[in-house]
From Swiss-Prot:
Spans traversing the lipid bilayer: 1-21, 29-49, 61-81
Organism: Platyrrhinus dorsalis (Thomas's broad-nosed bat)
Gene3D superfamilies, per database record: 1.10.287.3510
Catalytic class of the enzyme: translocase
Membrane topology: Multi-pass membrane protein
Protein name: NADH-ubiquinone oxidoreductase chain 4L
Amino acid sequence: MSITYMNMFMAFTISLLGLLLYRSHMMSSLLCLEGMMLSLFVMMTMIILNTHLTLASMIPIILLVFAACEAALGLSLLVMVSTTYGMDYVQNLNLLQC
């Protein structure tokens, strides 16, 4: 395993640990999710380029589309929650309330 793959795996792991440990604010959770998506994109792109898989070359682009949709939905949810409740604490949110 080359050092670039190890760096991307460590970036994914650190983002996952950040999501698990620092989930008090919604903004920090969204940033950790974006870090995970970025490291997955770079890893998939490097693997596809190194193995010369031409049929799978659209998969990183599809992942970026899903990451952009996730970011847009997350930011709109963050704006809605912060204007409604005045805070973005994840622990104080109860999504089952009307």
